[in-house]
């Protein structure tokens, strides 16, 4: 069935997951690794297969999707989130392909890498998250933004899938007390791997804690650029503003705090935020014990496109710390500041092209190792790893997508123009029981 049975290579300790699924219904182009292969069924009864093709960072790991019975138009497969041995997937499809403005079904699946319970990974379809639609006059699948859904594991069995948004607070009549005029709306499904019968979505309205005087622009046209699991919390981050830090997701009353990002070079609420966010990254490193914000500041002040002549960038990393102080319960401590001049002086042009780096992601194991993306502004996509402690490039530049000349992955090149988001770090490969599958192709 597979174009290449990629099951003989070593498995990385952690991987960088591409968000876009490579749908390849033709058996000749569907790539399969038997160690990561799984099958599932959508809510409409169609069968599909998935397989992750694993790669050592900075090369992204891809999810290949074979869905011959699935819709041919207006369909998409996405990797939504990951934590420990679980990965959250979503398949989108129109119920009626003849109506491009009709109802879209979003099926969520938990991909489970659990060597103790089965020979190969499993796919479990989650119950739908629904809401009433005035147009259809009935309950329909709730549309959760592609970048705004998080996944969090608790213990060996429990997990939660969550989306957090903001909503206006209703003022009490006659009230003069000055309060933040918004609340957090948490939509969460809590379940367990051992039992899924009682899993259901819940909506909770929660207050937001903060330590700032003026938040007038922070939540204006708020959107989430990514969700990062950190210890017992989910960080819903807007890369040009701050983090909605949702702690205690598995408790009856989770706590939501707003934490500003240390954005020294940007104006909050400025135009072009979606593209400016591509120069920032919130990373969990050192085995999940450290939360670090990485900021790449362009010297030319542009939000996108090739850099101006004779300009570069400054990369700064800062670690998030809880202080225990009631007045200022958290702070950002500067770890490293590296300029492009220093990097370019320490490395050859061939090993590190003189261009802007984007989508920074630190290694899940080592805080000094940064994986950075290079875009040629014509759809081409490359990656490079740098040791920030000595500013040395680690290995060659990896060509990921060839841009307009990439005929094999032309669909992904086109889709990335609309969803060029951060890669998702995941350690699920180390939960694969490779011994069980070595002799079972």
Q: What is the predicted function of each stretch?
A:
Residues 2-162, 374, 382-387, 397-399:
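General structural concept
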Residues 44-67, 181-218, 336, 345-348, ...:
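Acidic/polar, low-complexity linker and loop regions
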Residues 74, 80-305:
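A sequence/structural signal of beta-propeller blade repeats
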Residues 115-118, 192-196, 247-253, 317-331, ...:
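Short loop/turn segments immediately following beta-strands, especially the blade-tip
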Residues 134-154, 327-372, 424:
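A surface-exposed beta-alpha-beta supersecondary segment
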Residues 264-271, 275, 330-359, 395-409:
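Conserved blade-ending motifs and adjacent loop-strand segments that build the rim/top face
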Residues 289-320, 329-333, 341-353, 366-369:
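Extended serine/threonine-enriched, polar tracts that run as long, contiguous segments within proteins
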Residues 369, 376, 382-441:
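Blade-level signature of beta-propeller repeat domains, shared across WD40, Kelch, NHL, RCC1
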